[in-house]
Amino acid sequence: MNRKRKKIIGLGLLLLLAPSAGYAQGYSCGNVGLFCSPDTLRGAQLGAFSSVVYRQMRGLSLAGVINSVGGDMRGVQISGVSNVVKGGNGVQLSLFNNVSSSPFRGVQLSALSNVSMGMKRGLQIASANVSSSYMRGLQVGGYNYADTLNGSQIGILNVCVSHPRGVQIGVINYSRDTVAHK
């Protein structure tokens, strides 16, 4: 079987103005630039405006505006505005919002909102936290929502559809589950 192996690119210093001009196919162990966009990252990346990884990220990604990982992420995303990931394990830290389009395990910390399509085990802290599907962990914020809550919600308004385990602590707590312990 003839498989084409990806090569390690190494450290890239990209001070290009076009985002697509900074694209590097293969593994990158480090990037620094205005717009960083390797195929796969195993290491650290610092993008002044954006830090985009098209497939997998293992490591640290820092961006002034937005971080985006098109595949699985294991590591830390820190940005000034927003972090977006398909799914993974680790920490997302931003001023405005964090988004995971599939189940996430770890910590999402933001001033405005955290959204995930499920939290395997984790912590969401923001003004508004949404865990579509299930939440196994803790949500702390003004508004907390989970489809299935196996954990705790601490906030002003806490909402869940099903509440098999855990506790809701807040001014208004709502659960459609009639057997939930409130």
What are these regions (language model features)?
Residues 2-10:
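Bacterial N-terminal signal peptides that target proteins for export
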Residues 18-21:
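N-terminal signal peptide c-region/cleavage motif recognized by signal peptidases
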Residues 23-182:
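Surface-exposed, glycine- and small/polar-enriched segments that build interaction surfaces at terminal
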